[in-house]
């Protein structure tokens, strides 16, 4: 799957309405790093529709978001128009422009699977302040719904068979993978619950990378996928909102 597969209005608009679990992630960062006051400047690489940039703004006075997709950056600029604390521009993760004032923190949410690691780390080193932090994190929907074995069966035996995951690099970085100017700190994994109503869950699943791959290959249309989702899930999402479980990880990497 190419990075440019994310370059579509449909996906960009869908990203705006993703669950804002990034806030919980940032709260965990504050706890783990004993942050007592806001940082000055933060960079969010691979910012998507800006939800991760919004989370970074919780701990920074000013934030910059970059993404390889012009469609994503266009949505970001629309969402945060008129707010001088935000800046966005199109760039590869490996080609961030060196700012006048270097960043205290760089966040990378759900994007290191797609980068050239060595080039990315070299670029981050150039834009980070001394003792700055590279905070890499991700979270994803799992096959778990509170109180529902039917959902687990659907996820494993229907969804993943119809929409297999596209190939990606899912290696867990270690100190040996880092360039000499970085030190690997704590790496944690955790779960986060989130309540969905039926319609919102369908729309959320419509922007998963394996669903995007199926649509972009031409083997199914967007309307066909949405109809399949609704029919196959209707007996699972009965009544009130359902609590789905997300899994995630945080990696704290410090510049020496």
Regions found by a protein language model. Name each.
Residues 40, 61, 104:
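Conserved acidic residues
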Residues 131-196:
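Conserved catalytic/acceptor-binding region of the Class I
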Residues 97-106:
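A short acidic, Gly/Pro-enriched loop at the edge of an enzyme's catalytic core
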Residues 105-118:
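A short SAM/SAH-binding and catalytic strip from SAM-dependent methyltransferases
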Residues 43, 49-95:
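Class I SAM-dependent methyltransferase SAM/SAH-binding core
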């Amino acid at each position: 799957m190419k990075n440019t597969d994310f370059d579509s209005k449909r996906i960009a608009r869908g990203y705006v309405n993703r669950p804002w679990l990034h806030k919980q992630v940032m709260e965990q960062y504050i706890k783990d790093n004993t942050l007592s006051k806001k940082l000055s400047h933060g960079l969010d690489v691979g910012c998507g529709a800006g939800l991760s940039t919004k989370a970074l703004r919780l701990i920074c006075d000013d934030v910059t978001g970059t993404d390889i997709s012009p469609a994503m950056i266009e949505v970001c600029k629309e969402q945060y128009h008129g707010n001088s604390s935000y800046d966005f521009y199109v760039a590869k993760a490996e080609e961030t422009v060196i700012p006048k004032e270097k960043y205290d923190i760089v966040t990378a949410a759900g994007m290191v699977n797609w980068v050239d690691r060595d080039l990315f780390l070299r670029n981050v080193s150039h834009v980070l302040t001394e003792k700055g932090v590279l905070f890499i994190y991700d979270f994803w929907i799992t096959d778990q719904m509170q109180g529902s074995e039917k959902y687990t069966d659907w996820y494993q035996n229907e969804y993943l068979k119809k929409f297999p995951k596209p190939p990606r690099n899912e290696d867990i970085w270690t100190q040996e993978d880092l360039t000499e100017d970085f030190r690997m700190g704590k790496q944690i994994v955790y779960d986060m619950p989130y309540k969905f109503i039926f319609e919102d869950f369908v729309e959320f699943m419509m922007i998963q990378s394996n669903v995007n791959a199926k649509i972009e290959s031409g083997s199914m249309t967007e309307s066909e996928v949405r109809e399949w989702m609704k029919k196959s899930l209707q007996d699972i999402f009965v009544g009130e909102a359902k609590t789905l479980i997300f899994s995630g990880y945080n990696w704290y990497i410090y510049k020496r």
